Amino acid sequence: MRKLTTLLALSVFAATPFALHGEEVVALEKFVVTSQKRTEEIKDVPISVTAYKGEFLNRLGIGSFKDLAPYVPGLFIQEQSPNNPGINVRGVTTDSGNPSQETRVSIFQDGVSISRSRGSVVELFDLERVEVLKGPQGTLFGRGAQIGAISIIQNKAQNGTLGQFTAGFGNFGKIEASGTYNTVLAPNQLFARVAFSYVDREGSIENVADGSDLNGKNTLGVRTSLRWQPGTATTADFIINYQRDQPPGTAFKSGTFAPRGGNTRAFETAELNRGAELGIDRTVVGLTGIVTHDLNNAFTLTSITGYRDFDSFEAFDADGTRLNILEFAEDYLGEQLSQELRISYDTRGRFRGFAGLSYFDEKGSARVPFYTDERQLAAFLLRGSGVPVFNPDGTPNTGLTVSPITGGPLRAYNREEYTQTGATEAYDIFVDGTYNVTDRLELSAGFRSTFEDITSGYQVINALTPAGFPTGAANFPNTLFAPTNGLIQATRDYNSWVARAVARYKISSDISAFASASRGRRPDTLLISFVGGRYVPVELKEEIVWNYEVGLKGTMLQNRLNWSAAVFKYDYANFQSTAVNPTPPPLTTTVDAGNATGEGFELTFQGVLNPAVTTFGTFGYTDATFDDVNDRGQRQQLAGNTFRLTSRRTYSFGATFSGSFGPAGRIQLTPSYQYKSKHFFDDNNANAGGILSQDGFGLFNVRAAFQPKGDRWEVVAYIDNLFDKEYIIDAGNTGGAFGIPTFIAGDPRLFGVRATYRF
């Protein structure tokens, strides 16, 4: 920690986007955020927060979380598909599809939690800004913000008539279109806004099984919003968000068995069963109502009401081969209702703060069907005994027709499934305040208490016919899943608290320092597990994290450069990890991996060198590992292992060069570079011989824009991953539990052109 503090004291960086208002102005525009539930300049916020305006996102072509992550130190996004993201802040990942498990990183869309994994991926379009807060944020944001929060603030309807339309195309058959239109329905009182985004792109991996493609994209997002201002004291916003995702299948490619005529490299052709039937069909609908009312000059009442409904079906080939042995799907249904009431106090005096109540109700289910050809599965499981998996011509071996275990027939098709269910009802009470001790020193403190009722359920639907090759005696009559004989449920009540304490000191008019301590918490995990030959409720203790950090923020060079730096250290207790179950079923299980520690530092800068050149950069260092021993002094199973999806070093930088293109207009060139050091895809870094990892790599992107005079038109040409760098975004997966890990390739070189017309 001392070394990191020294580095902090020697560093100068930046944290906010810029804007230029004509060539005569060479300075950064003030950037206001609401990270602390009040409007304030980002340089005055004593939190490690990185925020970007919508204009910056558009300039760099950022339309998704995975595009955003490289420009936020401490943020790592793995997006296998819209149905299966992994969101990592400072080394801690949230990606569980179990509807009874809470997230570690919260995502909020206009103040409403959208954190549940299967419904959290949304397109980033027509945004006012995005704020990414690192460290425990439960006091400010509530559920799921154990180690960080992503806050999306969408553009609301405004008093005016304006719009724009964008259309473009690119390689891999890409077609895209987006647009916004804002209008006035009643002068000075009622306004409406509509925005949409559509992207369709073929997959970059060919599936030679039927000529279909994998790793593509097909997403439509639509948003409508109304704003009503009946008077100067009241503003009411009503927002409807809709998103439909129908991409082709994910390229889970086997690293063990090559496709016919190919190899096991993740970046080349795959041969997956079901062909074009693989893929995702996901629909997300969200309704949001926000009302703010100034009670008087001191108090403001805010109400945020949210409703979300989403369903997502994904069919995937878990073995990553032409073998018909591990054919899975996931059918997820989720519904949630939330309400927050908050009263804020601010007279521009020494004290300001807020207090409130919130309610959250959520229900979800994840149904997982499993299909297999028992003849092929038997050959695969007996391969160590000399049974060939494939025939000499490369076709799967279906010669085993009688089970060596049961003596019964082995069938060409058998199906079984399980369903996990979860329900949460929670009530929060919270308070947070800031007191200016002097003109230079301010102290902040916050507290949130949560009362929650959690229900977890599990049910197995037995095989169509008794399994010919059960993988364990307890599983019969099924192949993989031990029967439950109906739905098994358990309910528990929990009470908890989180808090923060912060001190901010204004060193000068341009520089301030802060120090904070905060407590984060992930609720107890309630599982239905198979123990001792029967299903029983199993509780894993709540995860607790204590986070400590110090930071500096400021501006320099006459407000031409913004910079920020922070050093952090956190201590985890009862850190939960996913591991292969030594006594299945199930194949994998959630375990208490004990204690863990993380430390690091984060740096950002952004500035304007002159009217023609602007620049930005970020750097992050994260050392997050499992401790050697637990609280009892016993050596931990994962001692010394690095958290999954955690690069020790990440950085990004770029610049925008602007200039006149004669009388025709202006041109802009924006090159950018992003780098991630080596990271693992499993908390057990040695799993599968340590091959479940990605070495350090960098991606170079470039954008060129032409703006004719009048600023109505803009044409942009772009290339992402200019040098066509090969890298993987995940490894292991379900196939890894059977000793045949699969690998997913990242995007290759993508390029295209888009044109925008503003009116």
List where the protein language model places each region.
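Outer-membrane beta-barrel translocator/receptor signature
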Residues: E102-R104, R116, F125-K134, T139-V208, ...
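Solvent-exposed loop segments that connect transmembrane elements
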Residues: I205-D213, T250-N273, D317-E327, P369-T419, ...
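Membrane-embedded beta-barrel scaffold of Gram-negative outer-membrane proteins
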Residues: G286, I290-D294, A298-F316, K506-R522, ...
